[in-house]
From Swiss-Prot:
The lineage of its organism: Eukaryota, Metazoa, Ecdysozoa, Nematoda, Chromadorea. Residues 24-263 are extracellular. Keywords: Cell membrane, Disulfide bond, Glycoprotein, Ion channel, Ion transport, Ligand-gated ion channel, Membrane, Postsynaptic cell membrane, Receptor, Signal, Synapse, Transmembrane, Transmembrane helix, Transport. Belongs to the ligand-gated ion channel (TC 1.A.9) family. Acetylcholine receptor (TC 1.A.9.1) subfamily. One of its GO terms (molecular function) is acetylcholine-gated monoatomic cation-selective channel activity. This is Acetylcholine receptor subunit alpha-type unc-63. Residues 347-470 are cytoplasmic. Alpha subunit of nicotinic acetylcholine receptor (nAChR). Probably acts in cholinergic motoneurons to regulate presynaptic neurotransmitter release, thereby ensuring normal level of excitation of cholinergic motoneurons during locomotion. Involved in nAChR sensitivity to nicotine and levamisole. It comes from Caenorhabditis elegans.
Amino acid sequence: MGPNDHGFAYILIFLLLSPPTHANRDANRLFEDLIADYNKLVRPVSENGETLVVTFKLKLSQLLDVHEKNQIMTTNVWLQHSWMDYKLRWDPVEYGGVEVLYVPSDTIWLPDVVLYNNADGNYQVTIMTKAKLTYNGTVEWAPPAIYKSMCQIDVEFFPFDRQQCEMKFGSWTYGGLEVDLQHRDKHLEKEIEEDVEGVDGPTKEIVWVVDRGIDLSDYYPSVEWDILNVPGKRHSKRYPCCESPFIDITYEIHLRRKTLFYTVNLIFPSVGISFLTALVFYLPSDGGEKISLCISILISLTVFFLLLVEIIPSTSLVIPLIGKYLLFTMVLVTLSVVVTVVTLNVHYRSPTTHTMPKWMKRLFVDFLPKYLLMTRPQPPGHHSKPNRKFDSRASTFSIGVNHVLGQNSELLSPGLNSNREESSFTLPRDNSPVRSAVESVAYIADHLKNEEDDKQVIEDWKYISVVMDRIFLITFTFACAFGTVVIIARAPSIYDNTPALA
């Protein structure tokens, strides 16, 4: 080992064995002197009747979750306390100029400020961090905490809703005459009167309000909620049991939901499915898929409704906005099933089962189509007279019969020749081949004419069903559009342009 190595070893041993620095000795001596006769179980006041003022402010770090189903808000906060402890004063000159000292918080008296409306039974802070002591006796303590607080969810306009959640803090043990809990920004307080529901009905109560009661300087923005306002309200209430008032500071967190997620995943699909209801009436009845489409739409809406039930709390106070829209759409789909059954019944009617009333033909065949912009196509070769084909067949048949009978005039009775121009004749009474042929041809002609008439009636029934489909198509399209606008547009947050604080 060379001389340089010996020198390094001496320096290292000196550093290890050297006593603490002067500052550390002073801080250690100060801590021992302060804690020597200190009783952390006793309220730090010089006289028993003296009131200890504790200033308190909430610093919101993160809004972790707002659980609508369980009505619980989870937050990550810092609880900023400050008070004067006369037992923790010292003269910096006597302790080497030490003006600030950090001590474990479990070695000094602490105010038992807890969250009253917690939802999981955890009233205390998460970590007992160190407290900051100043030579004049000021104690500052800002422990972090993750709280689950109760929050009554208003689902009336979900998912375009705004919520108001509260966090109520107060001393669990001391009354207002022993510990006066005040907001740290007391200089910004304003006094107002507030209506409060009491045991004997609504009463007026004096409340001290700080508009920006929560510190949002280190807030991490939420992906689901905008914070609109964070007032802090100080209440001083007296109860018949006690002489001392009980003081609490209630922080209100006004939230507005960011609607993009629910708009894309819930609103748009619901609106699209509702408009499919109208398209049912655009399908041809011969396809046989109208009822199937209606039932499929109804099942889809039921799935969305079950999804909504899993999200919102089980409340019977009000129906949420999206729930009203889904119910409205389900009613429309149910009506579309009923109407589709009626139109299919009309579509498949025939002369053997139903007789078409004259008013129905005039209304649905002659009157309504021109107002619905519908034009019925004419069959090929159709002219002004609908039964011209049968008239020509009858004329051909008459000419043929007259030709045959003209060559066999002895078979005709005298009345036949005299009335030939009226196409009436009398066949002989015997069963001649000519008589049988004429009767057969006449029967065939009548049968063809009846078939054509029946076919025309069937086509009229089908056309009436098409007209009904057009009427219901227009009606349901208008109903879907009108219902969508009226129901969705009722949400006040759609028109809310209030800038978010965070």
